[in-house]
């Protein structure tokens, strides 16, 4: 039986919405006073948290965010912590009177303690107590690797072996209301999918993912990471950097340690030509095209494979609905609705489609049978390559719309389609 030690816990308080709620959180720590070595409060610039007449003031230190990046800030801070455990209190969390010291212990088989919390209708599992040594070797994702900051803990938990996790059933952690919280129901619904169990896909159709990147260093790692944080992994993830002038390619090289990840680079040749280079490498049954600034739901491939297994051989493209988010700051997005797809059968219906058709899951053999993405004269194939390829496929194959939503579209100022919307009418003149 693990014995209680003195001063073996470092407390980290994150995302506290007011001074009142901070005081409430701190007061409930008094029952742990003998075990607390330090208390770190993560200061976010938009909140001025005050602490008045609190007996544990001697333990408290403030920590400023590094470049608005919670993951990086925590990773750096944790490397300096020497005590056995780190206790996370996030989103106005506090202990109830039911807390007992022996519940905040881990035996030799467990590395972390979690609890389940009901947030706006979704049950979210959250880390509570983690061995410091384990955290030093299992770092949190950086801000440009997760879609929004609220996904930090759930995305981290999703890659941890369930065998080392102890979940506490008793309700001894609660949360004060967040007020105008950034936790929308849509974000919580997304986050809850990180908790889905991994599923076998040995007998399912094989699928690769291809991403063409140009100067999307702020977003492309979110796209890549979303391919790995899946309940069913893809066979391969191909990323081609199309001559970026930012730090995209350098950042992408960090992912080559994963065997499924394949990184290519080229001078700036445009998206159609870049994707054709990737297509030469693909040998799976299907390939999903993921834009470098978009991302997938954690169960996306599980859902998609479910449709692919019964897809007619005459179908060259499977697509569904799109979930739209608007960029609102460095690490925040706001839900902007669902773009519901519809069946299309000919060129006229294709060009009258009000938004990009997606997600686009191509039958690889069909793509190769028409020699890949057309490089038309308009902009040398650098725009509307999705419409060009679908227009070519629809002449000899069927398209299949199914009502599913697993693909997240990011609207932001760097979006090429948004910037060049007026070119659409000119593009149509080149479409045969």
Enumerate the language-model features and the residues they cover:
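Conserved donor NDP-sugar-binding/catalytic core segment of glycosyltransferases
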Residues: 93-121, 301-332
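A recurrent flexible, glycine/aromatic-enriched loop bordering the glycosyltransferase active site
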Residues: 112-130, 343-361
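Glycine-rich, basic loop-to-helix element that forms the pyrophosphate-binding segment
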Residues: 66-80, 266-282
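Short aromatic/hydrophobic "clamp" motif used to bind/position activated sugar donors
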Residues: 86, 287
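N-proximal low-complexity "stem/linker" segments adjacent to membrane-targeting elements
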Residues: 1-28, 173-226
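Acidic donor-binding loop at a coil-to-helix junction in glycosyltransferase catalytic cores
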Residues: 145-153, 379-389
């Amino acid at each position: 039986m693990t014995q209680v030690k003195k001063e073996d816990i470092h407390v980290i308080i994150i995302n506290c919405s007011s001074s009142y709620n901070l005081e409430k959180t701190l007061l409930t720590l008094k029952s742990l006073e003998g075990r607390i070595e330090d208390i770190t409060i993560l200061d976010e610039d938009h909140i001025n948290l005050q602490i008045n007449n609190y007996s544990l003031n001697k333990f408290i230190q403030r920590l400023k965010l590094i470049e608005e990046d919670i993951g990086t800030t925590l990773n750096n801070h944790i490397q300096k912590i020497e005590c056995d455990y780190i206790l996370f209190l996030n989103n106005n969390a506090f202990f109830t009177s039911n807390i007992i010291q022996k519940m905040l212990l881990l035996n030799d088989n467990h590395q972390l303690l979690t609890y389940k919390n009901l947030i706006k209708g979704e049950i979210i599992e959250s880390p509570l107590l983690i061995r410091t040594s384990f955290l030093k070797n299992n770092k949190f994702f950086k801000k440009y690797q997760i879609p929004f900051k609220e996904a930090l803990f759930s995305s981290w938990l999703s890659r941890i072996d369930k065998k080392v996790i102890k979940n506490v059933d008793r309700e001894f952690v609660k949360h004060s209301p967040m007020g105008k919280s950034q936790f929308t129901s849509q974000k919580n619904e997304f986050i809850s999918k990180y908790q889905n169990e991994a599923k076998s896909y040995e007998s399912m159709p094989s699928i690769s993912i291809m991403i063409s990147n140009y100067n999307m260093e702020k977003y492309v790692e979110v796209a890549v990471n979303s391919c790995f944080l899946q309940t069913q992994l893809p066979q391969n993830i191909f990323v081609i950097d199309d001559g970026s002038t930012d730090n995209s390619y350098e950042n992408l090289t960090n992912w080559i340690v994963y065997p499924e990840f394949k990184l290519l680079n080229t001078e700036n040749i445009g998206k159609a030509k870049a994707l054709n280079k990737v297509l030469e490498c693909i040998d799976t049954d299907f390939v999903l095209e993921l834009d470098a600034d978009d991302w997938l739901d954690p169960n996306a491939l599980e859902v998609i494979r479910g449709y692919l297994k019964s897809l007619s051989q005459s179908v060259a493209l499977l697509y569904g609905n799109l979930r739209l988010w608007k960029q609102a700051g460095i690490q925040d997005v706001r839900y902007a609705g669902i773009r519901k797809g519809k069946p299309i059968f000919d060129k006229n219906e294709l060009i009258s489609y009000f938004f990009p058709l997606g997600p686009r899951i191509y039958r690889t053999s069909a793509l190769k049978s028409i020699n890949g993405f057309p490089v038309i004269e308009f902009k040398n194939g650098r725009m509307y390559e999705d419409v060009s390829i679908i227009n070519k496929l629809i002449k000899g194959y069927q398209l299949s719309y199914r009502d599913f939503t697993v693909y997240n579209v990011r609207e932001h100022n760097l979006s090429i389609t948004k910037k060049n919307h007026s070119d659409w009418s000119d593009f149509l003149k080149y479409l045969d």
